[in-house]
Regions:
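Short alpha-helix
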Residues: 183-199
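Conserved catalytic loop of SAM-dependent methyltransferase domains
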Residues: 204-231
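Conserved alpha-helix/loop element of class I SAM-dependent methyltransferases that forms part
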Residues: 45-63
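A short glycine-rich, Lys/Arg-flanked "PGG" loop and its adjoining helix->strand segment in the class I
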Residues: 142-157
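Class I SAM-dependent methyltransferase SAM/SAH-binding core
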Residues: 68-118
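A short acidic, Gly/Pro-enriched loop at the edge of an enzyme's catalytic core
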Residues: 117-128
Length: 273
């Protein structure tokens, strides 16, 4: 588990190759995000789909032609967007080749094994760059933002959904995020400054942490007996205990305003060079 505390891309790949199946078992689906929970979205799959829907609508995918999903995971979000917006061409960029192979051939989705900081696209060639709960792993994040600026057309959007810290917080307070945030722990102010100083203007911001972390932890606690039985069929007991304790710490960190979750919609700042 040394790679859960280190920060290079190979370690992030190892992390997701190990933890992704646990998340799939716990949720019963192929989404790898925390979900956006509500009174109408009370289970993981529904909450995860809801986050993708909200993110897709924020990104105005209904009017988009070409969108890059950077750090696309198992491509479940892209499949949802493809089905919702049949005229949209999606390009799933993932440094993790094993994850790219999971989905096999898909209509209107092209899979590209590449890094987030060197996007394999021409200048001014796409109208959306999407990073749904993945940008926390991009190193350096500033290079991804610069690359997004390069490949976007003038009217394009960069849209990011990302866990953030609210105040300075030690890794010991982050719970599950010690494992899912294998890269930097960005504060909201730092993230916004990084985006605006690299040629973008933020035009929409949604802070949704209380509808992400708290209900996710509550769901696991309420259904732990069934979920742990499923997980223990494939993994040792300590894995389930780490997950359980981390979820509780994550909920506490959210309630204490140590962590939050933000969606940011950005356009190119025409005044920047």
């Amino acid at each position: 588990f040394l790679w859960t505390f280190r920060k290079n891309e190979k370690d992030v790949i190892n992390l997701y190759n190990t933890m992704s199946p646990v998340m799939q078992l716990a949720t019963g689906g192929s989404m790898l995000n925390f979900g956006y929970w509500s009174s109408k979205h009370v289970d993981p799959i529904s909450a995860q789909d809801n986050l993708c829907d909200v993110f897709g609508n924020l990104s105005e995918l209904s009017t988009a032609k070409n969108a890059i999903d950077v750090g696309s995971g198992l491509s479940a979000p892209s499949k949802l967007w493809r089905d919702s917006f049949p005229d949209l061409n999606l390009y799933d960029v993932n440094i993790n080749f094993k994850q790219l192979c999971f989905s096999k051939h898909q209509k209107n989705i092209e899979f590209l094994n590449s890094t987030s900081t060197k996007l394999p696209f021409n200048d001014n060639s796409v109208d959306r760059v999407l990073a749904l709960e993945s940008a926390q792993h991009f190193k350096p994040l500033s290079d991804f933002i610069v690359e997004s600026k390069r490949v976007l057309i003038k009217s394009g959007f960069l849209v990011i959904a990302i866990p953030i810290t609210v105040n300075d917080s030690s890794i010991g307070k982050l719970g599950l995020l010690k494992f899912t945030w294998s890269s930097e722990h960005y504060s909201l102010d730092y993230l916004k400054n990084l985006i605006t100083s690299n040629g973008f203007k933020i035009i929409d911001e949604m802070l949704i942490g209380s509808d992400v972390y708290d209900p996710l932890a509550n769901y696991y606690v309420e259904n732990r007996k069934t979920l742990s039985r499923t997980i223990l069929e494939y993994y040792p007991g300590y894995m389930e205990k780490i997950l359980y304790k981390s979820l509780l710490k994550m909920k506490k960190a959210s309630q204490e305003k140590i962590i939050d979750y933000v969606l940011l919609k950005c356009i190119l700042n025409n005044k920047s060079k």
